[in-house]
Amino acid sequence: GKLLGIKEDYLYNLFDVVKEVSGEAYPELVEKEGYIKKVIKIEEEKFNETIDQGSEILNGYIEELKANNESTLAGEKVFKLYDTYGFPMDLTQEILEEVGFDLDEEGFNTEMDKQRERARSARGNMEGESWKEDPLSTLDSSVASTFCGYKHLSTTGVVNAIVKDDEIVDSITEGDKAIIVLDRTTFYAEGGGQVGDSGILENENAVFEVITTKKGANNTIKHIGVVKKGSINTKDALKSLVNREIRMASARNHSATHLLHKALKETLGEHVNQAGSLVTPERLRFDITHFEPISKEELDIIERKVNDVILQSLDIECEVMGINEAKEKGAMALFGEKYGNEVRVVSMGDYSIELCGGTHLNNTSQVGLFKILSEGGVAAGVRRIEAITGRSVYEYLNSRAELIEEACSALKTKEDNLVNRAQAIVEENKSLAKELHEVKAKMSLQSADKLMDSKVDINGVSLLTA
């Protein structure tokens, strides 16, 4: 299109033809016409921006070729256009041929090979530094762990394995940093975006502080931490005690992500899907597929929807069922996730139904409050929302109230007049700055006049002295 001289966006208009020809076979073309056309238009605009920027640089290269009486554009420059500015090599070639020039394709391929080698090298270094074989993979499946912490925070389990300094050991003692694997545990292992539990493993002789919990080889659950007291041996019985406050904080944020997901779909459209998440006791981070920034008005609507459902006190139910039954119930599945024949379905009244293996509350009212802190882009077509719930919202609102109180005190005004007072000070400062500028200009003129008055003529030459 560019080579034919078409400057305006046109590709998205062809959608009408596609819909007319294929709409019956693909009904979603009709159902989501507005959304599809908007996405095509946005992508076309982005591509045109890339083409415009690359064309400007390529024109500069062409002028250099003319000035140097050369006929071939170096492969390094062709690769730079491609790698840095996303300018396709075949388009570069077509434009060059239009004006009687050629490109060094062999040089371009050489640069491409170098780039691939750099990527392989970087990946190899990363794997060498951060990837290590899990020592638990050397054991058999008998070390597997059973998670029984959805409804209980405490149980007793037997030590199936201990890892210290990346080696399987039989015992650990006070001060040792280690990994303990139990046959049964109430500790949730990091997964589905939710961080692992923390807490205590103990018996009458020993205490092990669990800092975090992760999944390990052979379906194990790894309690990662340090021995605070006594010694622990394989086959010892240990009571698992999950930190209730931290588990509840994580559950509040996890349940809130489900409410947020539904509210986003209701407000922005059914095209919105989860693209990633992070659930910690302190806050939640939720990535979605969406093609443009979410406006303040939309964020306000989304936030209100979530808080409205919280206030409705909907029961949260978790059931294990067949994947087909879950789909029939309308459960949302995450794109790209692999599910077995049986799945865990988390329902929040009739409002939200999702497949999820994380820990949740019993009722939406336990979320307390929900507050969006920020929204922004993290990749093309992906937006990120960060939010807080429960006590974190209380602390956030308190800190804002204290900030307003301090501002009122500093500006010597009341809260309901704070904005007007701040605006008045800004205008006053602008006026004073203008007056100061005028005074300085006037003083400069006066100084110049005074300097001219002090000139002395010496043999016909005017001499100024300061």
Q: What is each PLM-predicted segment?
A:
Residues 1-466:
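A glycine- and charged-residue-rich anion-binding loop/surface
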